[in-house]
Amino acid sequence: MSGPNRTYSFGEGDDSLAHPSSRTHAMHSQYDDVSPISDGARMNPMNGQGMDHGLASVLEDGRQGWGRSPEPSPSLLTGSSATPGMDNLGPGAVGGGISGIALSVANSHDRLSGVEALMGTDGQEANIPAERGLSTTGSDNPYVPEPPEHRYSYGSNIALGAAAAPAGQLTPGQSVSHLSSTNPSQRNLYDIPYQDVGGLNAGPYQRHSAYSSNDLPVDINPDEIVDDGDDGFVPAPNSGSGARKSQAIPAAAGGAAAGGVLGNLGGLFGGKSAADTSYGPVPGAGLEAGEKGRWVKPKPGGGNKKRGWIVGAILAFIIIGAIVGGAVGGTIGHRGNEEPSSASSASSSSTQTATEDTSVNGDLDKNSAEIKALMNNKNLHKVFPGIDYTPWGVQYPLCLKYPPSQNNVTRDMAVLTQLTNNVRLYGTDCNQTEMVLHAIDKLEIKDMKIWLGVWIDSNETTSRRQIDQLYKIIDDAKDISIFNGAIVGNEALYRAGSDKTSAQTTLINYMQEVKDHFKKKNIDLPVATSDLGDNWDATLVQAADVVMANVHPFFGGIPVDQAAAWTWRFWQDHNVALTKGTNKKQIISEVGWPSGGGNDCGQGANCPNDTAGAVAGVDELNKFMEDWVCQALDNGTDYFWFEAFDEPWKIVYNTGKENWEDKWGLMDSARNLKPGLKIPDCGGKTAT
């Protein structure tokens, strides 16, 4: 997921769709065979209340509400598109966008590894064409509720990511006494300090230790960081930036900055290092993420300039401390105290590194008492076709100093195997793919598949490293059949800003290279990329073997009782339609709902009250799953759920009334199902 101001709109040239008269019933029938729900109960067109719940609760009566098509006010058009799989910064972040400093760090490289997050940061993209959004609920959807009040764009400032940071994990026996016993997803930064950096003598493995200590973040010597790059640090934005929520700077790199910022502190405080090792955008690479000119040093102005530097320094200290703490607070072992009493008592120690975890607990497998307990949760059901996943601690180059834990990945996979047979990864750094493969082997899981992920960056060094590691993984694999395919890049076009044409060319070249390598090795695997639904066009469809779109109704401001239908309709109109006449498969690569933290009304607008628009909450998450999961399972709709586990370190990016960054998991960071949350059992039917 990425970026602030996530916008949903129809693609170029589709303005005729703005009126119902231009939409024919033929479109309705065209997609009947792929609808994840079936026609059934009628809806009240005035209030959207159906006689039955679920996607199946709508008939053609919804046409009564389809007639509104006012011209959009320019002030309501968002300037960029994003999904929530990758971002951790923006207007929804600390300080309403973290004036200048953090944004310059995080607006362009959302799910990067390590130092890449800090290099080549861009400012607000002013030249991104405004999206022409259109409420896609309506008459031609066989199960769509009465559409909400018409909007021309569904924007939201978001800052979270599935792979920007991994699904949270704890060391074995790590104390989580500070987590709420009633609803751990509702705690805030002051309730749950996530790191006690002074106590982390052995590494970043106390995810829940604390900000409660007065110790400063761990000292970092930038000269010891691999691929350290320093592009300098801009202290403050110009006066006109960040004034409107709907024009917030893309926050694509927030998660990467948080996950790997330790590797670039030298760039914040020091001078230039070798340009070749920098992770800034490569001129002409075609994947640059925005317009640097939007963030400039303040003009000379006496006290104003001085105050700007002071404020900048303070914000820099706060953000760096939070980010470093988030990275260092990353843990490797058991996420809580759910281990059985028969488990090794040594695993209840307060802190364990990856090496210590293995030394104490051995290489966990299906016969380990701890694993047996994790794999026997009657409240988990295998009803998700796929789940997005990134292990904790795989930010490069931080992982070179603090390696992620194999046992931690094995614990995660023990849980994930009860939810899905299909896991999507986002990158190849830090042996994350190899650890997942090892976990599957140790757990003796026979039906789990993996979508390989390759992070594509504006910096050729990063992309090259990721692709080369993909080749090594494939070459070393004992059985290629465990892989479902390779996803080359996630939301690379979104991060390209206005330079989508050049970015698309670069992205397609990378995809073609991977295809050529597979062909040379006689490997029959599809090669795809994932991006916003409205970033797909015929050219990209032709290049990809599978069309993968990230679609999040929450950031469209869609009320939850209409969210499932809206998601399906948006996917149909933006993605499925592009594959007509081809044999291309379509997959929703990210979809989910946060369990708490406020509400989003889309368009970058402030909600008039706490119940307007899309409301985050456990009840709402239950409703979205109730309306989506089993119907999609029955009808074969292929998607990846975002996500399995909360990522509590992201709490540093919550701000104001937008406090959902750390609350997208079905489970808390200790792998406990959230209180009150109910995963549908779909009558015993399971995903295959």
From Swiss-Prot:
The active site is at E491 (proton donor), E590 (nucleophile). InterPro entries: Beta-glucan_modifiers, Glycoside_hydrolase_SF. The keyword Acyltransferase does not apply. Residues 1-307 are cytoplasmic. It comes from the Eukaryota. Its main location: membrane. Residues 175-188 have a biased composition (Polar residues). Residues 341-355 have a biased composition (Low complexity). The chain crosses the membrane at residues 308-328. Glycans are attached at N408, N431, N459, N609, N635. It is found in: Cell membrane. One of its GO terms (cellular component) is plasma membrane. Its EC number is 3.2.1.39. This is Probable glucan endo-1,3-beta-glucosidase btgC. It comes from Aspergillus fumigatus (strain ATCC MYA-4609 / CBS 101355 / FGSC A1100 / Af293) (Neosartorya fumigata). The lineage of its organism: Eukaryota, Fungi, Dikarya, Ascomycota, Pezizomycotina. The gene is btgC.
